[in-house]
Amino acid sequence: MKIKNKEKGQVSIEALLLWAALAGMIGLFTPAFAHAMDAYTLHAHTNQFISFSETLQETISGISFAAPGTQTLLQVPPIENMTIEVSGNEIHLTLAHAQLAHDKKRTITSAWPIEGTLTPGEKIILRREEGKITIQ
């Protein structure tokens, strides 16, 4: 069966209309999909932030009562918008994001002064020394 020129044109127009409808549907759902992915990423970062703060609190508590010279290795997760400040006997963790109603804040306390810095995405060594805890 041969397709005539007029029918070829009709098939081409129908194919273009189908492709245009498909592109329109993709364009319609892309923003909704992007928003869902942003919400999922924020939820994952928040859970990771809470988990890390609990792990850090347990580690600091354990090493605070250990003998001088005791050390442990800890991975600081690379969480976007997380700030870490070390001040005296406390480590202040903050997760700030425009979609959060309030910043998530955690304070880790120690029986000893803490010296050093924590950088997101790096491994650190917590070492109990005489009268203090150092972060390397």
Residue ranges and their predicted role:
Residues 1-8:
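N-terminal leader/signal peptides at the extreme start of proteins
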Residues 15, 20-41:
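C-terminal juxtamembrane segment of a hydrophobic transmembrane alpha-helix
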Residues 31-136:
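N-terminal export/assembly leader peptides and their processing motifs that target proteins to secretory
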